Amino acid sequence: MRPERLTVRNFLGLKNVDIEFQSGITVVEGPNGAGKSSLFEAISFALFGNGIRYPNSYDYVNRNAVDGTARLVFQFERGGKRYEIIREINALQRKHNAKLSEILENGKKAAIAAKPTSVKQEVEKILGIEHRTFIRTVFLPQGEIDKLLISPPSEITEIISDVFQSKETLEKLEKLLKEKMKKLENEISSLQALYTAIWKYLEENDLEVLKSELKTVSEKKKELLKKREELQKEEEQLKRLLEKYRELVKKKERLRVLSLRRNELQKEVIYEQKVKKAKELEPLFREIYLRQREFERFSQELNSREKRYKELESEKEAISKEIPVHRERLSKLEEIGEKIKEELDLLEKVLKASRPLLEQRIRLKENLTRLEEEFRRLVGEKEKREKELLSIEKTENETKNELEKLLDELSILKKDHMKWLAYQIASSLNEGDTCPVCGGVFHGKVEAVEFNIDEFEKLDQKRSELENTLNVLKERKKSLSSLIEDLLMKIEEGKKNLKSIRNQIEKIEEELHRLGYSEDLEEKLDEKRKKLRKIEEERHSISQKITAADVQISQIENQLKEIKGEIEAKRETLKEQREEMDQLKSDFFDRLRKIGIGFEEFRILVKEEVKDAEKELGVVETEIRLLEESLKELESENVRDVSEDYEKVRNQLEALSQEISDLERKEGRLNHLIEETLRRERELKSLEKKLKEMSDEYNNLDLLRKYLFDKSNFSRYFTGRVLEAVLKRTKAYLDILTNGRFDIDFDDEKGGFIIKDWGIERPARGLSGGERALISISLAMSLAEVASGRLDAFFIDEGFSSLDTENKEKIASVLKELERLNKVIVFITHDREFSEAFDRKLRITGGVVVNE
């Protein structure tokens, strides 16, 4: 992974940083607490969504971020492809957004993942390592630059195990292995139980015995099938005889029923003759009925027209009485209308004279409303700013108190800091070395000093932040005081303007009162106009009513004349219809007397349906004749009842079929048992094979468990293989960086790593500061590449401030050789003198890059 660019906003101590990485060495320099060490954490968080210090992602947001949001943009190259990651962490809303894209050759971006979890998974696929391995290989923390180089063999084994075999990973692996073995134990136990059950089943069900029993059952079934076939033939013969007997009985019964029906039909034929004669008179009866209905309809119409004639005469009389009343109301409305018009003219003159004053009053009231709103706004703004000023004063006092406590705490820590710096310088000196501080010769043993430098830098950073906060609060306080004074002046000016406008409005209202204007003048005008319109509408309506009444009387007179003619014509028609109907009734009753039927009997007969009983009688007599002939033929064959013989044979057949069915079920059960026995024999062989395979697998896993978690065996073997790969890479780096001067090897008996200087062995602790740093970095990079593949970037957090100027220059000149590796190498230091030795450097102060 080769970093290209990192943009950071409000992440830990970094407020606003934009860095472009280049091949070679870059030195990041700045005071303690400036945010230098946060650069690597920003890269780690951008890639994996995890830092190093805190488990909670929202703790990485800078506490002074106004919007509570941290933003990271990281561009890098891997395997010939370029990628970009964008992450935003909002601590206020508890939101974490992430997006991973590939940067294409045309500059466009193709999205790969858009959620924190999926981005982390895709990054792990691209880099081929997880977060834990990344932070243990790509980053060399403060104070550990030569830890691996000078450690004894036991510690080297622990360091390698920590990188490649974390305790958590081994515990997880051991747990999985135990679960797998437990699962295998359960499966083997289940299979063994199944094996025992199958073996028991095969012992209980002997295959040869089952086959012999099946043969006996099949032979017996064959005999019974033959016997059933003979009985079925006998049953068929008896069935035919029984059917003939039943046919004879059935025909005799049918003959008896038909004889009775023939007697009934003979009576029905006589009755139907009367019905037919009655139906011949039905058309005449219908005509009389229709003539009667027509006569009644005409009578009703005549009564209706006579009634309508009387109604029209009454309606004409009522309308004639309404017309004089309408004319009197019309005259009164004309008088009222003239009076309202005079009142309306007077009110319109007053309104016309008042209109200029009214328009002026409206404009003044609008200005008054606008000024009142502005006045209220200014008063509200003043109160708001006064509250804000009180809040700032409170915050200022709290910040001062916090700063005083912090300064007291820092004063105590600074004394321990000086002791710790002295210890750091002394611990790097050997017996007889020149002290870089006093220039004297170093003698004696170094006494260890414990000091939490991270806590000291954190408190110092907090002090700087509190001082900046106090300055900001003072400026804001001054600005608010000035703003409140301006608001007070504007409020006084607003009061004067409001009073002036209210006086002008009062004078205009006095003048309007003098003219006779009142606030409801326009309402009175509208009311008068509405009354006038209402009177005009009523006058128009009454005029229309008078005209309509005259027209209505004329129409009624025409209708009366027309209805009178209709009444006379209908009376003449009714007289003619009565004479014709009397003649038809006389003819009808004469014909009824001739055929010997009374009127009531006629009404019953005419409703009857003619069923043609005479035709049915012929059919019945024909069927009786045919049945008598058929019965003679059957009686000549001596047909008898064989139902008892038939039932006896059927019962024998049913019993035989049941026995055959029982044998078939037994035959099926035996076939199933034989198939099941054969299947279980095959299953038994398969189980024997599977049990052997699973037992072998269990033994292999048990062997793996014994060797994998035995530190005396596996760890020594694993460390040896890793060291072979690490030393091979380190030798190659040293050959390039020192032109073949230095070589490195590992000897467990000689206490760890052995350095060869032009072939002469030297202990690692005997190297100069620059030589040791160069070899340590080469060794650390080699270990990182073995763990994570090809390594194109390396970050080193190491201070060299304890060295004098000459030693710093020596170390810097040696470390410059790392430029030849064509990698991105970043040194993080708070020593400006050390950083000046390098061409490319960044200075970070207060969380921002101040120069490049």
UniProtKB/Swiss-Prot annotation:
Its EC number is 3.6.-.-. It catalyses: ATP + H2O = ADP + phosphate + H(+). PROSITE patterns: ZN_HOOK. Residues 155-345, 389-427, 460-488, 534-711 form a coiled coil. One of its GO terms (biological process) is DNA repair. Pfam families: AAA_23, SbcC_Walker_B. Belongs to the SMC family. RAD50 subfamily. The two conserved Cys that bind zinc constitute the zinc-hook, which separates the large intramolecular coiled coil regions. The 2 Cys residues coordinate one molecule of zinc with the help of the 2 Cys residues of the zinc-hook of another Rad50 molecule, thereby forming a V-shaped homodimer. Homodimer. Forms a complex with Mre11. This is DNA double-strand break repair Rad50 ATPase. It comes from Thermotoga maritima (strain ATCC 43589 / DSM 3109 / JCM 10099 / NBRC 100826 / MSB8). The lineage of its organism: Bacteria, Thermotogati, Thermotogota, Thermotogae, Thermotogales.
